Amino acid sequence: IIASFVNPLFRKIILSEEADLSSTEDADNSSANDAYGQQMPSVSIVITAHDNAAELRRNLPLVLAQQYPGNFQVIVVAEKGDSETENVLKLLSADKHLYYTLIPESSRYMSRKKLSITIGVKAAKSEWIMLVEPSCRPESEHWLANMARNCNKDKDLVIGYSRYDDDAKMYQRFERMLIQCYSLREAQQSMAYRHYGSNLMIRKSLFMKQEGFRSSLNLVRGEYD
C-alpha cells in the first residue's frame, strides 16, 4: 500500500549555492505541528555517496539538524579510499545521529549503488528506511517529520517529491516534474514501478523479505525501478 506525498520538500542542487532556509511556509509549519501531535516512528535515513564530498559537506548537516519528534539515525555508505568524503564524515562524526560505513574496494563486479543501499538498509536500526541522495537537501527542518507522518500501519511505502533547484534550466525542472507526476500517479493506482530514490521511504522488513537487489546485483543500473 502506497502513500504518495506530493510536496516539494526536497530540492536537488544543480550547480547552485545554498539557499536561505531560515524561513518556512505556513503550510509546512502546519504539517509539522500535526506531526508533533502524533506518535512518530523511528526512521533510518540512508545516504549512498560516490565522490560526493562537496554535496555531503553542504547537505548532510541539514539532514542531521532535522527537528523530529522521534528517534532517527543517518547512515552514510561511502566508498573506501575516497579520502575527501571520509574527512567530511569524520568532521561530523560527533553528531549522535550519524553512522557511516565504507564499501570495500574489492566489490567491483557488481552495482556499487545497489550494494550501498543494501548495506545501509541492513545497518538500519529502524523499521522505516528513508532513501536520500547526497545531492539533495531538505527545504526545511521539518522535512522528515512531514514525510514520516504518512508512515501508518497499513502502508509499506511513502513516496515524496523532489525537485531541481531554481537555478536549473527550465526544461530540466519541467521534465523532472513531469516524470515524477507520472510516477506518482502510477503509484496512486497501485502500480508503482520506479522512483528517483531521492525522497523515498520503505519498510526494512519488506526490503529484506524481497531480498532487496539480490537477483539484480550484477546489473549496474535499475536501482530505482
Show the residue positions of the predicted features.
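N-terminal membrane-anchoring/stem segments of glycan-assembly enzymes
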Residues: 1-35
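Cell-envelope/extracellular polymer assembly enzymes that use nucleotide-activated donors
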Residues: 41-44, 73
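Acidic donor-binding segment of Leloir-type glycosyltransferases
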Residues: 61-106
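Short, conserved alpha-helix that lines the donor NDP-sugar binding/gating region
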Residues: 86, 90, 113-122
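Long helical/loop segments within the catalytic core of UDP-sugar-dependent glycosyltransferases
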Residues: 93-112, 116, 146-214
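Short aromatic/hydrophobic "clamp" motif used to bind/position activated sugar donors
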Residues: 129
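Acidic donor-binding/catalytic loop of UDP-sugar-dependent glycosyltransferases
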Residues: 133-149
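Acidic donor-binding loop at a coil-to-helix junction in glycosyltransferase catalytic cores
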Residues: 218-225
